[in-house]
Amino acid sequence: MGWIPCSGKSSGRNKTRRNGDHKLDRKSSDCSVSTSEKSRAKSSLSESKSKGSDHIVAQTFTFSELATATRNFRKECLIGEGGFGRVYKGYLASTSQTAAIKQLDHNGLQGNREFLVEVLMLSLLHHPNLVNLIGYCADGDQRLLVYEYMPLGSLEDHLHDISPGKQPLDWNTRMKIAAGAAKGLEYLHDKTMPPVIYRDLKCSNILLDDDYFPKLSDFGLAKLGPVGDKSHVSTRVMGTYGYCAPEYAMTGQLTLKSDVYSFGVVLLEIITGRKAIDSSRSTGEQNLVAWARPLFKDRRKFSQMADPMLQGQYPPRGLYQALAVAAMCVQEQPNLRPLIADVVTALSYLASQKFDPLAQPVQGSLFAPGTPPRSKRV
């Protein structure tokens, strides 16, 4: 995972399996988490921890154990790479389980601060739609995080980096993923005290198990949200270009609605198959939200926004409703955006309405003439 200030221009991305965005001007003050900040997080979130009787405390691993698990970080075990370092698939003999092991680059984008925040957050928080942190390693200058292994990779892999021969996501699976990701965000916003602002929601941070069940990952940028009569927390602007809420990019004032905006961008990606920022497109279509806003105003154009990879196999009413949710989430004014709980309600309903492509006609004509409808995902 990599970050750049949200207000900056998108830089060229390295072609890796994970985002290769660039983080700029990381200050030395970011390389540690203050004792008061850690204490506040621990005490404030302790109630959430105590409510989860099935919570598993993160284990500590030696570097030697993780080297053995990945066969000395062999290239064949590499499953992801980005500005933070590399992710390997490994087998933990001590727990008899397969795991994803993230080895942070000493000179990479994720410093000690982000490492500590992620260990702290994922040790205290537990929800089916959050990735499970198995443990970590802090031997000498080595920093590694050990997660449950998610065999289908990230949502980004299935929307934008589809390998040859891989079937695109069908409509039902897309709505299932959208609803699950929203539930993970709802847990952070509404089920913890104080709330947690994720701050880095994007397709590459939504991981999928072998049944396309989504889990949010990478909590290095997460912040404790406002409490009492405070409406926001002020922080240096960090995130990924294309996903940041405009008011956060301009002022550094972070709210729960900042996450809702980011979710709206992700939902648009799920529906349209387009990237949040795509420099390969014409000028007016490079920014997904800017491209979508004029189309939101004319329902007759909604079918133009459906991912061509769906080949017209989607429910028109479901498409309109999903786009309506996305449009509300990416409103420029944060007070006009819905609460994430309302988003969960809407998307859970859409996910429950199973679409049968064999029982309904193909919509539109955006796919190539003569292209046969795809078979249903098994």
Swiss-Prot record:
Alphabetically ordered keywords of this record: ATP-binding, Brassinosteroid signaling pathway, Cell membrane, Kinase, Lipoprotein, Membrane, Myristate, Nucleotide-binding, Phosphoprotein, Serine/threonine-protein kinase, Transferase
Pfam families (alphabetical): PK_Tyr_Ser-Thr (PF07714)
The species this protein was found in: Arabidopsis thaliana
Catalysed reactions, semicolon-separated: L-seryl-[protein] + ATP = O-phospho-L-seryl-[protein] + ADP + H(+); L-threonyl-[protein] + ATP = O-phospho-L-threonyl-[protein] + ADP + H(+)
Consequence of gene loss (knockout): No visible phenotype under normal growth conditions, but mutant plants have reduced sensitivity to BR and enhanced sensitivity to BR biosynthetic inhibitor brassinazole (BRZ).
SUPFAM superfamilies in the record: Protein kinase-like (PK-like)
Region (Disordered): 1-49
Biased composition (Low complexity): 32-47
Residue list for modification Phosphoserine: 204, 234
Lipid-modified residues, N-myristoyl glycine kind: 2
Job of this protein: Serine/threonine-protein kinase involved in the positive regulation of brassinosteroid (BR) signaling and plant growth. Phosphorylates both BSU1 and BSL1 in vitro.
Biased segments, Basic and acidic residues type: 18-29
Membrane topology, from the record: Lipid-anchor
Gene Ontology molecular functions: ATP binding; protein serine kinase activity; protein serine/threonine kinase activity
EC number(s) recorded for this UniProt protein: 2.7.11.1
GO biological process: brassinosteroid mediated signaling pathway; positive regulation of brassinosteroid mediated signaling pathway; protein phosphorylation
Modified residues (Phosphothreonine): 62, 235, 240
Compartments, as annotated in UniProt: Cell membrane
Name used for this protein in its record: Probable serine/threonine-protein kinase PBL7
